A protein has these predicted regions:
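Active-site helix of classical SDR
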Residues: 121, 157, 165
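Short, small/polar-rich loop/turn modules that mediate ligand/substrate recognition or access, typified
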Residues: 173, 178, 248-250
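Short C-terminal tail/terminal secondary-structure segment
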Residues: 146, 238, 249-264
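Residue(s) in the substrate-gating loop at a strand-loop-helix junction
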Residues: 141
Length: 264
């Protein structure tokens, strides 16, 4: 289905790998001009080059800036003062026991997972309202509504994403601008692949059975009993950004394979 995103300028933060990269690719597939963001210029350049080769009708652009740094973030905003779609995907996670989480760790997660995206939203939202079109999408996690206890500092920031997006959506009343949050469940990113490698390399279990074993023993509530693929998240994000999802406003949308057992 044609999503109506051709030639839209889309900024996806943290888009050199994982879910962010998959989101960027799906936007490019829809004909959007995607701004690729990451801290390492060489990683950004590789993704931009790959998108240009696969989708020559589009104009992917590079934004090699660490958006947790105010100076670098301002450079990004100067280079791209307006966008049609902002996907706040960039974030960090790390399993930690609560006793080990220092104030410095709490602050780092807050700065990275909340304040950086908030700063971009504060810049772009007024411009979207002026032209009466725009989409801001925060990528959270099922941890936002069902904390596992494995990484409280991460779960807290993802819950804050939900509240922030809902608050920002209140500013878009009677416009064609929307602000929403998407909560993916466990997804087969490079980071998760590395985690499985670490968990199972020393075991006798064949590699092709790692995923099923992980889901059975570590994500037993999942109804699909497999890891979500990044491109599945990417396709959902492009739909939420499209004109077809214009009635979605202030929503917390789940794509978790049934992992969260509650209705709401």
């Amino acid at each position: 289905m044609e999503m109506g995103l051709s030639k839209k300028l889309v900024l996806v933060t943290g888009s050199t790998k994982g879910i962010g990269k998959a989101i960027a690719k799906e936007f490019a597939r829809e004909g959007a001009d995607v701004v690729i963001n990451g801290r390492k210029a060489e990683d950004v350049a590789k993704v931009v080059s790959a998108l240009k080769e696969e989708f020559p009708q589009t104009n992917p652009q590079a934004a090699p800036f660490d958006i947790t740094d105010e100076t670098a973030r301002n450079q990004l905003l100067e280079q791209f003062p307006e966008v049609d779609v902002l996907v706040n995907n960039m974030g960090i996670f790390q399993p930690m026991e609560v006793e080990a989480i220092t104030d410095a760790v709490w602050n780092r997660f807050f700065q990275t997972n909340v304040l950086s995206g908030n700063a971009l939203a504060k810049h772009y939202l007024p411009k979207m309202l002026e032209k009466d079109f725009g989409r801001i999408i925060f990528i959270a996690s099922e941890e936002a509504i069902m904390p596992s206890g494995e990484m409280p500092q991460y779960s807290m920031t993802k819950t804050m994403n939900l509240s922030l997006a809902k608050s920002l959506s209140k500013l878009t009343k009677a416009t064609h601008v929307t602000v929403n949050t998407i909560m993916p469940g466990s997804t087969l990113t490079e980071g998760v692949e590395a985690m499985l490698e670490e968990m199972y390399t020393q075991s006798d279990l064949p590699k092709e059975e790692w995923e099923a074993d992980f889901m059975k023993n570590h994500r037993p509530l999942s109804q699909i009993q497999r890891l979500i693929r990044p491109e599945e998240v990417g396709r959902f994000v492009t739909f939420v950004a499209s004109p077809y999802a214009s009635s979605f406003s202030g929503e917390a949308l789940r794509i978790d394979g049934g992992l969260v057992p509650t209705i709401f």
